[in-house]
Amino acid sequence: STLFPYTTLFRSQEQFATQRMLSEATKYSLGIVNKSLHNLKNQGYINEDNKLTDKARKDLNNKSPQNAIILAAGLGMRMVPINMQIPKALIEVKGEILIERIIKHLHETGITEIYVVVGFMKEEFEYLIDEYGVKLIVNDEYSHKNNLHSLYLAASHLKNTYIVPCDIWCEKNPFNKYELYSWYMVSDRMD
């Protein structure tokens, strides 16, 4: 997999003592770990001690996430009737409001430039501006257009960006200081 060498690169920062430990942490076979470390050395990303080189640090820093866009405009029809009085992003799960947990996770990772695309009950999100320093983008067409339109409205802010749905709950912080590839947070798997 082309993603594995970068996973190895990130994990090698965690100072794994052996390739076996790295294999267990990444869930890749020992053979793939060995081959990937060899490739990373040949490409100049790690040295003979499996430590990051200046080239690797520069690449990681250039590609680290700069901001986040949280998509929160929709009606959330799958959650009716729960969300008819409150937007789905503001529902409390395990003692925390969904969107606040996402924002806190982003802040823990150093992401403070956060845009929230709102529509349905948009006024309910205004407290986030003062409390967390987010910026709101209004999607007035939320009732008949989907998340792609919300993302279009935020397109000028895309730059090494996390794009996150507002109605997820993660036990552990899913965000990282370094990401070499864009990804959209969605899964049908339970943590």
Task: Report the location of each language-model feature.
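The conserved acidic donor/metal-binding loop of glycosyltransferases
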Residues: 166-169
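Glycine-rich N-terminal loop/short-helix segment of MobA-like nucleotidyltransferase
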Residues: 21, 59-92
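Short, small-residue-biased leader/transition segments that mark boundaries at the very start
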Residues: 2-9
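Glycine/Thr-rich phosphate-binding loops of Rossmann-like dinucleotide-binding domains
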Residues: 78-79, 124, 171-172
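Structural signal for conserved beta-strand scaffold positions within catalytic alpha/beta enzyme cores
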Residues: 92, 138, 184-187
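Short amphipathic alpha-helical segments
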Residues: 81-84, 127-130, 174-177
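Conserved core of the sugar-phosphate nucleotidyltransferase
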Residues: 46, 171-191
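Conserved N-terminal catalytic core of the sugar/cofactor nucleotidyltransferase
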Residues: 10-67, 96-163
